[in-house]
From Swiss-Prot:
UniProt short sequence motif Cell attachment site, positions renumbered to this chain: 50-52
GO cellular component: extracellular region; plasma membrane
Presence of keyword RNA-binding: no
Disulphide linkage map: C5-C20, C7-C15, C14-C37, C28-C34, C33-C58, C46-C65
Gene source species: Crotalus simus
Keyword S-adenosyl-L-methionine attached: no
GO biological process: venom-mediated suppression of platelet aggregation
Spans through the membrane: none
Tissue expression summary: Expressed by the venom gland.
Oligomeric and partner information: Monomer.
Protein name (database record): Disintegrin simusmin
Ranges where the Disintegrin domain occurs: 1-71
Compartment(s) of residence: Secreted
Keywords for the protein's UniProt record, in alphabetical order: Cell adhesion impairing toxin, Disulfide bond, Hemostasis impairing toxin, Platelet aggregation inhibiting toxin, Secreted, Toxin
Length: 71
């Protein structure tokens, strides 16, 4: 418990493999809305639209790509 990131790989520059905590200055370690340890800006498409659905976009506050509520 208390893990902030997946510490399986010491190669991840955002995550301290010894503590499973984000490195200083890192906002995230992985996820569709995480790029180089930082949250991708709000409104960036993280999952393109399919059919009549709208694009899923990053919130700017999380590494996760939220599902569009209008699916």
């Amino acid at each position: 418990a208390g893990e902030e990131c997946d510490c399986g790989s010491p190669a991840n520059p955002c995550c301290d493999a010894a503590t499973c905590k984000l490195r200083p200055g890192a906002q995230c370690a992985d996820g569709l809305c995480c790029d180089q340890c930082r949250f991708i800006k709000k409104g960036t498409v993280c999952r393109p639209a399919r059919g009549d659905w709208n694009d899923d976009t990053c919130t700017g506050q999380s590494a996760d790509c939220p599902r569009n509520p209008f699916h």
